[in-house]
Amino acid sequence: MNNPFTLSFGKKPLQYISRISQTNQILETFRSAVPSNQIFMITGVRGSGKTVLMTSIANELKQDDSWIVIELNPTRDLLQSLAAKIYGLPDMHSRFLNARLDFSAFGLGVSVENAAPVTDIENVLELMLEQIKKSGKRLLVTVDEVTPSEYIRIFASSFQIFLRQDQPIFLLMTGLYENIYDLQNDRSLTFLYRAPKLLLEPLSYFSVRNHYQKFFDIDTKTAGKMTDLTKGYPFAFQVLGYLYWENRRCH
């Protein structure tokens, strides 16, 4: 059996202590017939499990045919990237062609005869989102480790417009507290103040201890010492579990 723990940041490992409360809160809100929020911001210190939580939620919704899930790179032009990824979806691509939408100005497809090309990227996404709405689907966009960069600010401003248009777009972002704080302090992005923020606290001492004790079949005292070393950080839980597994024959 391969090591069930991982040293990779953000990758969901085989041995994983889930944050059931936060996961259910986001999933139930997004899946609601009339969602009270279409954005969640997950924050916490490095190693607190932000990316793993976001990935877990994204993977859950990927299994639902009524959802489209797209991950964006925060260091690139997010609007352009989102449009390109939506256009690359076979179901959506055919819908755009049937609706005679010409996105060739952005390198998306070819010119459509007797159709005026759309020349504004925000307008491109509005038209795409309208087609997603007509298909009965919802779109989840995930962005990991956001910073108050120009690309992020522009994307957040456009997202605010999409919300006012009642578009079926949802946003899940992770970031260090100071970056989230700086982003929401932008005068044009004050709506982010109202966006729910989940601050990931350390894992429960008893959850970590019990997990180690049961998985490694060790006594409570040994499991407790291991738990103390993790300080409740999910990544530390992974690292210690990984090392214990690799050296289990020595114990």
Give the label of every model feature segment.
Residues 1-40:
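A short, basic N-terminal segment
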Residues 77-108:
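Conserved NTP-binding/hydrolysis module of P-loop NTPases
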Residues 195-223, 229:
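Conserved small helical "lid"/interfacial subdomain of P-loop NTPases
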Residues 41, 55, 59-77:
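Conserved catalytic segments around the Walker B and adjacent sensor/switch elements
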Residues 217-251:
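Amphipathic alpha-helical "lid/sensor" segments that cap RecA-like P-loop NTPase cores
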Residues 37-41, 68-69, 138-140, 170:
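Residue-level preference for the first positions of well-ordered beta-strands
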Residues 36-56:
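Walker A/P-loop nucleotide-binding motif
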Residues 114-178, 185-186:
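Conserved Walker B catalytic segment
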